[in-house]
């Protein structure tokens, strides 16, 4: 199931993809209950936000699947009710506009570590944080602070936590995963590497595009065998599979949850492959007017234009 958060008629909604349309899940599920009547054990309603939906777990997913099957039959809805939209009719937002935590793995691709002359291969995964307020969605603009900041790009697979986890093991870690999305790790390298100020360099406003959707874990057979690409103005800059990971996904989740509780809706990003602009010769940095297009197989495409910060 591909799940989206979107805005329509000035209201924030969420839904799932069905035959190239978006189904408003809370409305569709209410219509299903009205048509069939309540059933033993059924949810009385779906939550109002995608974050609440994720936290509701399997009962919410079961209800959503039933709602999609109902809408596939093109039922007549009450006058004034609408549950389906074309993608062009809505504004896509970040699937989780304000995640509780955004934790990103650094130097987790062998190819990326090798292109960095100062990198050291570590015994344990390395993480940094992005703050929730820098998140934007598909189609929104990355605001460029100025050329001296050396703004760089990086495509990453992000894990969406479904069940709270603390001290997970590699054997059970994936059972806590709700799904996967695309994260664009935008960085101001001049700030990041000047005085080793990674937190500020990673957290300029708009420096964390996420989307376009969350794909539920059951649709990704092996998250460790996906192809990731990033194109800058149509030119391929990154193209790798995550078989290049240094630390596999269960190991990253085990390590991170040994220190903190990961909660429903938290994001853990798994690193970027080689091809980032800072380590190219000559270097390539983002500038106003650029367009970044990120794709991960099985998930979709995340595209964002770059504009000057004052625009």
Model-inferred region functions:
Residues 1-121:
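N-terminal non-catalytic cap/leader segment that marks the start of a structured domain
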Residues 4, 91-94, 115-118, 142-151, ...:
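A generic local secondary-structure boundary/capping motif
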Residues 7, 107, 130-132, 139, ...:
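Short, structured patches in soluble enzyme cores that scaffold and shape functional sites
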Residues 9, 76, 112, 187-311:
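Catalytic-pocket segment enriched in acidic/His residues
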Residues 16, 120-137, 153, 287-298:
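Structural signature of FAD isoalloxazine-binding scaffolds in flavoprotein oxidoreductases
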Residues 94, 101, 149-151, 254, ...:
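Residue "hotspots" at secondary-structure boundaries inside conserved domains
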Residues 97, 104, 137, 152-154, ...:
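Residue-level recognition of short, solvent-exposed, well-ordered loop/turn junctions
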């Amino acid at each position: 199931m591909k799940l989206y958060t979107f805005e329509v008629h000035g209201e924030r909604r969420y839904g799932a993809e069905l035959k190239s349309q978006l189904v408003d899940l809370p409305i569709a599920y209410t219509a299903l209950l009205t048509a069939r009547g309540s059933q033993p054990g059924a949810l009385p309603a779906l939550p109002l936000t995608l974050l609440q939906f994720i936290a509701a777990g399997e009962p919410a997913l079961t209800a959503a699947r039933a709602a999609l099957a109902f809408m596939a039959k093109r039922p007549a809805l009450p006058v004034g009710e609408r549950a389906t939209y074309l993608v062009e009719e809505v504004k896509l937002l970040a699937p989780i506009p304000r995640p509780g935590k955004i934790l990103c793995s650094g130097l987790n691709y062998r190819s990326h570590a090798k292109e960095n002359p100062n990198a050291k291969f570590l015994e344990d995964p390395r993480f940094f944080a992005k703050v929730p307020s820098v998140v934007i969605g598909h189609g929104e603009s990355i605001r460029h602070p100025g050329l001296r900041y050396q703004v760089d790009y990086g495509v990453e697979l992000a894990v969406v936590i479904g069940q709270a986890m603390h001290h997970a093991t590699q054997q059970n870690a994936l059972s806590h995963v709700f799904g996967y999305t695309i994260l664009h790790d935008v960085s101001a390298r001049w700030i990041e590497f000047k005085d080793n100020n990674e937190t500020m360099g990673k957290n300029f406003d708009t420096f964390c595009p996420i989307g376009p959707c969350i794909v539920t874990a059951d649709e990704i057979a092996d998250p460790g065998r996906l192809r990731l690409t990033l194109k800058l103005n149509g030119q391929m800059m990154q193209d790798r599979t995550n078989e290049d990971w240094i630390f596999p996904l269960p190991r990253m989740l085990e390590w991170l949850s040994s220190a903190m509780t990961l909660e429903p809706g938290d994001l853990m990003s798994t690193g970027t492959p080689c091809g980032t602009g800072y380590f190219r010769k000559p270097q390539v940095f983002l500038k106003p007017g650029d367009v970044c297009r990120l794709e991960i197989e099985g998930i979709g495409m995340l595209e964002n234009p770059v504009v000057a910060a004052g625009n």
